Amino acid sequence: MQGPGIVSATVAVTTIAPGVHEIDTLLGGWEHMTAGYLIDGPRPVLVETGSQSSVEVLLEALAALGLEAEDLAGVAVTHIHLDHAGGVGDVARAFPGATVYVHEKGARHLANPSRLVDSAARVYGPLLDSLYGRLDPTPSDRIHVLADGEQIDIGAGRHLVAVDSPGHAKHHLGLHDSDSGLLFAGDAVGVRLPDVGVLRPATPPPDFDLEQALTSLGRFAERRPSGIALAHYGVVPSDPAELLEEARETLQSWADEAERAWREGEDIATALGQRFAADLDGFDADKRKKLETLNGVHSNAAGFRRWLETRDSAAATSTAIPTNTATTGENG
């Protein structure tokens, strides 16, 4: 592998820890939007491919790092959203010996992505093809389902530990590097773009669940990582424990405002936009557009709305079911 930084007209690679290389995939042509991470070793593993639209940038970066077709041993995605896993099929084709690692609840969508792509097309419309691209299928015999606590062997005693972390999505997991101590957190901690510097929760539909998301942050904290590497974007220059607490407080604040608006019949997106507008004070229109494109208030509001509807519906159903202990055998 080459040295601390590789920069060209289309490639930006930074070594962020011994044997860990951050790749800027240049999603949508923006710098520092979506990262992939190569963990070096006898069995190199790529964490996150980014979108299909930026996969050529990723492949060029891997080539610049010295990887040939037979060298990559694994590709791991924290979840199957297209900005994280859209390039999996292309990368699997370019590296025919690489095993693809994914959460159990996402595996079938990598093998047959038609439903995932159709759902994304309904959400993003024309933006799907212009910003993200699609997702080519991965042969099912190349896919390995990761269980919580399972290790991906990188060789020389180094491994990545899978940490089940639903909340952002039911198919989300973190990956903890045994050597550097870095935790690759996907979107479970939120989004923090370096040129904006504001941590914002990522709560998209259809899977967002507040209780699970908060629990996942606690699970990350229990692992005591040396640093948090976000897909959006990079290693956050904060104490990991403090960052995770900030993520918890920020997520709870957004959820509280969303629920208040929901209860009072207000538009959730409008309420969130007004409540947290000050977070973006001082940033120019391009930086605001960059953040809103990746992690917009309307997307977060839709996730909160879906979560509130699901939670309230479940509570109403539970209340409506009568309890008849006489038929359970518990009374005699």
Enumerate the predicted regions with their spans.
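Metallo-beta-lactamase
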Residues: 4-8, 15, 51, 71-83, 110-164, 170-238
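Conserved beta-strand hairpin/beta-sheet module of binuclear metal-dependent hydrolase folds
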Residues: 9-65, 71, 175-185
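Divalent metal-coordination and catalytic microenvironments
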Residues: 19, 39, 48, 58, ...
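Metal-dependent catalytic neighborhoods of phosphoester/phosphodiester hydrolases
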Residues: 85-95
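Histidine/acidic-residue-rich catalytic or RNA/ligand-binding cores of hydrolases
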Residues: 238-249
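C-terminal regulatory/interaction regions
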Residues: 257-332
